[in-house]
Amino acid sequence: TALVLALVLLVCLAAGCGKKKEDNVSGSSEVKKPVMIKVGASVTPHAEILGVAKELLAKEGYTLEIVEFNDYVLPNTSVEDGELDANYFQHRKYLADFNEENGTHLVEVVPVHYEPFGIYAGKTKSLEELADGAKIAVPNDGTNEGRALLLLEAQGLIKLKENVGFTATKLDIVENPKNLEIQELDAAQLVRALGDVDLAVINGNYAIQGGLNAGKDALAVEDKDSEATQTYANVLAVKEGHEKDAGILALAKALQSEEVKKFIEENYDGAVIPMF
């Protein structure tokens, strides 16, 4: 009898220990760390910068999948629909305007860089040579058109309605001494259009993609201390409620790392400027 009791006791103890160990394993498994982070990005410079972050994240146990886009809509709708975890392609104002116009719920996580807008030569090779009735191409989306027109105003080429700011369109031009013809084109087509217009005001990423550099090739660029620097900072964005996800925080940290800062400064010659 004593032997039977001893055996029962040993079995119970073993079962208890096993359960306790099982509970501990179960408890530790509740700490979830996503392995895959899927991010949408413009090809240049965003996907290139993410390539540096990808290496840093790999050391933390994350796999970063970079999905490249050539438009400004799908990267946002894909995050909203849950097809992507985040995106990195747009500036603050575009993000705010997109949410308002489309009823999406996207939020900024961190700013990463700033791309100065530039005025680039087409048929006309300098601002001084600009003839009466010259054609100037600008982005046709509301967010970037205002920014382009403000740069033209800063160069004394046009004058806009007072306090119209970044919402300006060509309809807000009140003075146009050279009778410039403002052509609104898709931002992605501006570099290709240079052969057909006198000048074009081009987004930083599309300029780089087209082999142009704001620091070297532009006839004029936005002032580094202008309001545009903050307003148009390019950000990492996610759907609201996911800002504190472990993978997103790891990605944000990688994008604001010294390695990324060094990569930007060494590879873009002033066409891309880190915001950290």
Predicted regions, residues:
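Periplasmic-binding protein-like
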Residues: N144-E153, L255-M275
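Short, low-complexity disordered leader/linker segments with a strong preference
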Residues: T1-M36
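Short helix-initiation/N-cap motifs at beta->coil->alpha
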Residues: I66-T77, V164-R192
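A bilobed periplasmic-binding-protein/Venus flytrap-type ligand-binding module shared by bacterial periplasmic
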Residues: P116-L127, Y232-D245
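Short, well-ordered beta-strand elements
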Residues: K32-T44, Y62-E68, K135-I136
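Alpha-to-beta junction loops
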Residues: E80-Q90, A134, L157, K178-E181, ...
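Ligand-binding "clamshell"
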Residues: D97-V109, K123-T124, D196, V201, ...
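A conserved helix-loop-strand patch within extracytoplasmic ligand-binding domains
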Residues: V109-I158, K261
